[in-house]
Amino acid sequence: MGLVAAVGILHVAFMVAEVGFWTTLVPKLKIYGEAQAAATAEVGKNMGAYNGIFGLLLLWLAWKAPELGARPARAFATSLLAGVVVAGVVGGLTIRWTIPVFQSVPALIALATLWSASESPKR
């Protein structure tokens, strides 16, 4: 669950950046100019809210996984990480091509690690 927590931390950081620093960060990253950044600030806050939800749920899951048990924790992690992958792909198609690199790729690595480390089914 370590990589699940890492993806959670990334998404909390995305939330802070999108909610608190959209109008200054977006022009510096050359995503939009200053006028467009100001005009899309509310959209940035909305994106930040969703990233925060993903981040906090992933962090909660990493913390509570031992209590949930391996199979339920893995199922919940898979659902959340798949949502992160989809959100990253959509962001890459609609906003900027780098979004999947920073959002989907870490989630895919966490998914691959999660599933490769899981027990093989008993026959």
Language model features: what each stretch is:
Residues 98-108:
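Non-cytosolic membrane-interface motifs at loop->transmembrane helix junctions
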Residues 67, 86-100:
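Membrane-helix boundary connector in multi-pass membrane proteins
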Residues 20, 63-64, 93-97, 116-117:
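Helix-loop junctions at the membrane-solvent interface of multi-pass transporters
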Residues 1-9, 72-81:
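Interfacial segments of alpha-helical transmembrane regions
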Residues 109-123:
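Membrane-water interface at the C-terminal end of transmembrane alpha helices
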Residues 56-74, 119:
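Juxtamembrane helix-break-helix junctions at the cytosolic face
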Residues 59, 63, 88-89, 108-112:
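Alpha-helical transmembrane segments of multipass membrane proteins
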Residues 9-18, 29-63, 79-82:
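Core segments of alpha-helical transmembrane spans in multipass integral membrane proteins
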